[in-house]
């Protein structure tokens, strides 16, 4: 269960910077020219704002509710945000999709960290907490590389359709592995 939740954290972290190489293509896709690069900053900052905004809220919710359900809900929000982003042909829709991705992705972190508290006794939590932190950072580092690989084969929208597919697979795995309440 922790492996699947950690993979979800890595997926969301990768999305922070996966758009770096796709930014100009995304701008063109919503009708913004390269000469207006400053208008594209919300594509990245919208994700980050959503990501950061939900950290304390989801942390508290995961203390009160079933952590697995919180994880599943966050994965669904992330998948919906990814689909909205992939379908966007206007900047406000693209930003909305990115914010939704951030909200879903940001919620995965505290829910996964709380899951560690359920699965390990206090004196054994160091390693699993380190794993979650490491995969989050690895996701951030690999995001631009993954974006480049996808862009070599397809358009920028494929990045987000792959997110949808990965989120749904992780949803199924977490649902199956965590069929008991955690």
Model-derived segments and their meaning:
Residues 8, 71-77, 81, 97, ...:
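Residue-level signature of the transmembrane alpha-helical cores
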Residues 29-31, 66, 87-93, 121, ...:
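Helix-breaking motifs and short loop linkers at transmembrane-helix boundaries and internal kinks
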Residues 26-27, 61-62, 146-154:
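Interfacial helix-cap and linker-helix signal at transmembrane-aqueous boundaries
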Residues 53-89:
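Conserved MFS/SLC helix-loop-helix module at the cytosolic interface between two early adjacent transmembrane helices
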Residues 45-59, 109-113:
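Central cavity-lining transmembrane alpha-helices of secondary-active solute carriers
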Residues 164-182:
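C-terminal membrane-cytosol helix-exit motif in multi-pass small-molecule transporters
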Residues 22-53:
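Extracellular/periplasmic helix-loop-helix junction of adjacent transmembrane segments
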Residues 101-134:
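Cytoplasmic helix-loop-helix junction between adjacent transmembrane helices
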